[in-house]
A protein has these predicted regions:
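Bacterial N-terminal signal peptides that target proteins for export
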Residues: 1-9
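Bacterial N-terminal signal peptides
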Residues: 9-17
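Sec/Tat signal peptide C-region and signal peptidase I cleavage site
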Residues: 19-23
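C-terminal/domain-edge helix-coil "capping" segments
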Residues: 24-58, 88, 130-134, 146-149, ...
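N-terminal segment of the mature soluble domain
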Residues: 55-145, 176, 180-184, 211-212, ...
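Extracytoplasmic/secreted cell-surface and envelope-processing proteins
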Residues: 69-71, 149-155
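Glycine-rich, phosphate-binding/catalytic loops in enzymes
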Residues: 78-79, 158-160
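Short beta-alpha junctions and helix-cap segments that line functional grooves
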Residues: 127, 153-159
Length: 226
């Protein structure tokens, strides 16, 4: 009986490949594509929620810098996701908001008077200068880098698809009075969209993946300070 059992185990090992004695870790090379798998960390939804600020300060939101290289639809989806997140953080007074948001016209004039040496890489002193001219307490800067996208799945008549997008954003929030950063990081998050589709009906959407990824970046940003 023992010999038969040993033979069965040996056959199984030869058929499927014997497992190593010690679990093998993924190498740093394997990790390069981990962000765009279909995807284990895909939607970190509902881990954090953006809530309206309860501290009555004034804030200037500088023009969003889009370096994504996406098509028009993707750019619009990303911009709308950013705007929605900011409106959650800073709702208007009629919806209970306690913050004063600088007008787009005033921000444009202040930036014209204090141009950045590098529009896509403003330094602390430049952001503070804009904030002081506007007379605001805080300044917000946002930039989106080119996303890394991947599509997986198959389609014959009925199939499944997954789009995943790794979204990378440079995000800054400056306290003008203290002349210090409240937030100054490059944030990277993954958004994904999956679907089982019939022919081309009801498939996964790359724009939904982008929207989720941008929303996750903005949540990480706007929940870091009140």
């Amino acid at each position: 009986m023992n010999k038969k059992l040993a033979a069965v185990l040996l056959a199984g090992a030869l058929l499927f490949g014997a497992a190593p004695l010690q679990a093998q870790e993924s190498s740093s090379i394997d990790a390069v594509t981990a962000g765009v798998a279909d995807t284990d960390r895909a939607d970190k939804e509902a881990e954090k929620k953006i809530t309206a600020s309860t501290v009555p300060y004034s804030v200037a939101v500088l023009p969003y810098i889009d370096q994504s290289g996406m098509d028009e639809k993707g750019r619009k989806v990303a911009a709308n996701s950013i705007k929605d997140a900011l409106k959650e953080k800073y709702p208007p007074a009629k919806k209970g908001g306690v913050n004063t948001v600088a007008s787009a016209k005033a921000v444009a004039k202040a930036m014209q008077n204090h141009p950045f040496e590098n529009a896509d890489a403003p330094v602390l002193a430049e952001l503070v200068a804009v904030g002081k001219e506007l007379g605001v307490d805080r300044v917000i800067y946002m930039e989106m880098e080119p996303p890394r996208n991947k599509e997986t799945g198959f389609m014959v008549i009925v199939g499944s698809q997954t789009y995943s997008s790794v979204i990378t954003m440079k995000l800054k929030c400056v306290d003008v009075k203290t002349e210090k950063y409240l937030f100054n990081r490059i944030v990277e998050e993954v958004g994904s969209s999956s679907a089982v589709a019939f022919w081309k009906i009801g498939g996964a959407s790359q724009s939904r993946a982008v929207k989720k990824g941008v929303a996750a970046c903005m949540t990480e940003f706007l929940t870091a300070f009140d």
